[in-house]
């Protein structure tokens, strides 16, 4: 049975057989095809002549216009169809019920009892809430119920052991505690330490943020750069007395040339380090001392003295070429390493921690320069000599306390660790007026430096006098 479709709309719609509609459509297509076939044949015969006359642009525009007309004719001949369907009540799409978006058909909708569905949805929503409320009620007595002392004793041993169990420590927490303990972060002493760098907080050259790390590095590396305390054994022509004479003379030259204090301590270090590595003849010892001071001046001073100045001071005992040659030999032997922690660096820090006055400063440097002259003081590290010099100066001046917690914190040394070195320094002070090397004693006897060498040595640190034979 042939299908039928309603053409038009409303009450006047007429049913047209589908077979008749197909026949009319085919005839129209044949007529259009014949028309355009004739058109394109004629157009093809004359395209050369028109191309020459009108140009390629106009010809192409005409050709495109013909194609557009053909397409418009095809669109215009299509009839407008309207499908009349039985009137049905409007359907409201339920969520997730029909997502097919069908055009020519309808998806089968499930028959749902809305009251039952709403009740089921409400039950589903209430069940989790009810379950959570029950859990809360079950857990609530464990929080608020307080057991009596008698009930606590009734607990089994496993429960008592679990209650006494220490909290679990992770690897990160253990490593953090070890690191803080090694750096002194959790040390109880640090809470009592006065900030000696507070006054320099606005001074960028003081590097307050790094000063603790710098001096910790100095203390850790000072033994690496220390000269040998037994190098005199390998020297064949010089001895301790000759070294003392040379150092005493260099202190006088340093004072007359008004050089920086750092230059003096670096000069003595260079001499001792070079003598630890090289066997020096007796006649070249002064040349080594002059060349070492020239190197230290170039390293520390803003305006270093000239070579001829040292030649004049040494009474022209050697030539300019000898000084420069020895200077090069020393630098090569030391591998050009002049950045070392000297005694002077530690003294500056320890005096700051001592919170003393100018007199304490002069007395400390007096003991430090006495230590420079004596070869036997090489047995002690520079940081130990610096701390012992501060301790001996406080003992000599009668300051109290002799050694504070602040000094112990910044030096890392307790009072018993300083006694041996401090006793040697005070003994040198007691013997200075009668010693042959009196430059240091006379230098610090001047009022300009507080005449600190004229103070009586600390009797507390002097050895007891030997009994007088009857």
Curated annotation (Swiss-Prot):
One of its GO terms (biological process) is cell division. The keyword Cell division applies. Keywords: Cell cycle, Cell division, Cyclin. GO terms for molecular function: cyclin-dependent protein serine/threonine kinase regulator activity. The keyword Cell inner membrane does not apply. GO terms for cellular component: cyclin-dependent protein kinase holoenzyme complex; cytoplasm; nucleus. Pfam families: Cyclin_C, Cyclin_N. InterPro entries: Cyclin (IPR039361), Cyclin-like_dom (IPR013763), Cyclin-like_sf (IPR036915), Cyclin_A/B-like (IPR046965), Cyclin_C-dom (IPR004367), Cyclin_N (IPR006671). It comes from the Eukaryota. Belongs to the cyclin family. Cyclin AB subfamily. This is Cyclin-B1-3. It comes from Oryza sativa subsp. japonica. The gene is CYCB1-3.
């Amino acid at each position: 049975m042939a299908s039928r479709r309603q053409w038009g709309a409303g009450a006047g719609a007429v049913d047209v057989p589908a077979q008749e509609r197909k026949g009319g459509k085919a005839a129209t297509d044949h007529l259009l095809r014949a028309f355009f076939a004739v058109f394109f044949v004629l157009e093809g015969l004359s395209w050369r002549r028109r191309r020459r006359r009108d140009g390629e642009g106009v010809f192409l525009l005409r050709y495109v216009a013909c194609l557009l007309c053909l397409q418009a004719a095809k669109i215009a001949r299509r009839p407008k169809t309207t499908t009349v369907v039985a009137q049905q009540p409007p359907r409201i799409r339920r969520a997730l019920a029909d997502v097919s978006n069908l055009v020519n058909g309808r998806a089968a909708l499930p028959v749902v009892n809305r009251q039952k569905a709403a009740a089921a949805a409400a039950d589903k929503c209430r069940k989790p809430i009810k379950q959570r409320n029950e859990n809360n009620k079950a857990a609530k007595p464990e929080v608020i119920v307080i057991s009596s002392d008698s009930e606590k004793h009734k607990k089994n041993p496993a429960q008592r052991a679990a209650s006494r169990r220490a909290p679990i420590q992770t690897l990160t927490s253990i490593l953090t505690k070890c690191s803080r303990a090694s750096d002194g972060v959790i040390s109880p002493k640090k809470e009592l330490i006065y900030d000696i760098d507070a006054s320099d907080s606005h001074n960028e050259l003081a590097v307050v943020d790094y000063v603790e790390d710098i001096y910790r590095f100095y203390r850790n590396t000072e033994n690496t750069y220390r000269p040998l305390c037994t190098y005199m054994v390998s020297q064949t022509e010089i001895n301790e007395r000759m070294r003392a004479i040379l150092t005493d003379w260099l202190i006088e030259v340093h004072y007359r040339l008004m050089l920086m204090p750092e230059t003096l301590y670096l000069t003595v270090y260079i001499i001792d380090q070079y003598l630890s590595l090289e066997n020096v003849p007796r006649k070249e010892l002064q040349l080594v001392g002059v060349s070492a001071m020239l190197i230290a001046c170039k390293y520390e001073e803003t305006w270093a003295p000239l070579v001829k100045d040292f030649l004049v001071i040494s009474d022209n005992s050697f030539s300019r070429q000898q000084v420069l040659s020895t200077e090069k030999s020393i630098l090569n032997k030391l591998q050009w390493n002049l950045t070392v922690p000297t005694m002077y660096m530690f003294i500056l820090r320890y005096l700051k921690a001592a919170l003393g006055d100018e007199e304490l400063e002069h007395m400390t440097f007096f003991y430090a320069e006495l230590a420079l002259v004596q070869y036997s003081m090489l047995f002690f590290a520079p940081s130990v000599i610096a701390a012992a010099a501060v301790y001996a100066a406080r003992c000599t001046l009668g300051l109290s306390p002799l050694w504070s917690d602040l000094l112990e914190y910044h030096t890392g040394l307790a009072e018993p660790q300083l006694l041996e070195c401090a006793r040697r320094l005070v003994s040198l002070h007691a013997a200075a007026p009668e010693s042959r090397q009196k430059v240091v004693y006379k230098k610090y006897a001047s009022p300009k430096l507080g005449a600190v060498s004229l103070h009586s040595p600390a009797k507390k640190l002097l050895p007891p006098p030997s009994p007088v034979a009857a």
